[in-house]
């Protein structure tokens, strides 16, 4: 154990995903030896993320504006919505060049052990985008007033691109049942070939591209 600000920094770095105590210690000692201007830029970048990033009011992706660049792009196919767990998953799919529709970010996956149920995810706003009504009364009661917006009547297909793990599959199954209430809506899931038990962000572009193009209707 170190003392004072150094140990405080190590403790805070250790709280970051994927950063253990040893990695946090290496990063902290690296920061002790960098130019002060590098520290200043890091502080400014952290402040910029906190103050300059918000969530798109339509798809819940991270954005600098009220509506993100993808939702604002008239060239995107508004009739197809790809549902993902986190904003980082959008970047993975975009790199394939296979998808030209729009997205919806759930903000996680169903996980009863972590007390994450439907009300903790951005499910109600997805249902509103599709049909403007909420078939689940519990979800309707949990929707903040400032989240309401008109439905997109041209939505033809919803692609469930949650992670191929236990939580992701449970979330896709739950959403599939909810979306069955919307007539004429095609509901699809990424095709087989995705590694079971993994996260979307670690799937290579070729595999993901094939999974998108070969998606299966459910």
From Swiss-Prot:
The keyword Zinc-finger applies. GO terms for biological process: DNA recombination; DNA repair. Coiled coil: none annotated. A zinc finger (C4-type) spans 56-71. CDD domains: TOPRIM_recR. Keywords: DNA damage, DNA recombination, DNA repair, Metal-binding, Zinc, Zinc-finger. GO terms for molecular function: DNA binding; zinc ion binding. Residues 79-195 form the Toprim domain. The keyword Metal-binding applies. May play a role in DNA repair. It seems to be involved in an RecBC-independent recombinational process of DNA repair. It may act with RecF and RecO. HAMAP family: RecR. Belongs to the RecR family. This is Recombination protein RecR. It comes from Corynebacterium glutamicum (strain ATCC 13032 / DSM 20300 / JCM 1318 / BCRC 11384 / CCUG 27702 / LMG 3730 / NBRC 12168 / NCIMB 10025 / NRRL B-2784 / 534). The gene is recR.
